[in-house]
Amino acid sequence: SQAGRTTMCPTELFFFFLSEHSYIRLLPIETRAAEASVAQFKRIPRHWVNIPLDLSDPDNMVQAFAQVAKTKPMPVEQAIQMGFHPDMLESAGKPDIVLVPAWRHAIVNFDHPLLRQGLRILDTPGLNALGSEPELTLSMLPNAQAVIFLLSADTGVTASDMAIWQQHIRQLDDENPISLFAARNKIDVLWDDLAGEAFVQHAIEKIRNDTAKQLGISRDNVLPISAKQALLAKVRKDHELLERSQLADL
């Protein structure tokens, strides 16, 4: 993703050991007009757009993953017929035209040590996806073994954050045994060399305690992290920075 743009459709990441190649498969948004579910479409390969992934070519990876963030213009009436709420959509700059996700669902298959162990990650793009794709809330989320609710550390828990939590996530723990976590990303914005490490740790602990109280979960299940600094640490092979990012806790 890039500034101002993130994944626009639910995206699954996993490793299918019988597949000879890595790939991204994309289900066009127009399939929402059909009565078939995403699970049913998974059994019909011809409806999916297949993009090969070359893990040795960074430019290829960037171009391929950029597809997951794509949008397309559509008349607002057509968007409503597809189940979108117009107030949740971005204007295309023309009267009665809005931007909708180009894809309904994305599947990413590639080899990774964690994915080889059977881990399957489902990334959802936020409230609009949860509210307009019933299969997410009725099937996919309830079948998860753990849900990690990603929040920014440089803002509080917003009203829209609480709406997602209360309407779609909190009750999952009541229906099935499931682990609920909150990851507070961007803790590096709190890093302040002038104030000292004690001040920084106090600020991070306050965020953990406040978040746990607001969401009604254990403080131990609130994980402060910096994904950006963890990535930089991996690239630079900086073990101290990686430890400070706290990604290992996650």
Segments (PLM) and residue ranges:
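Globular "head" domains of long coiled-coil molecular machines
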Residues: S1-L250
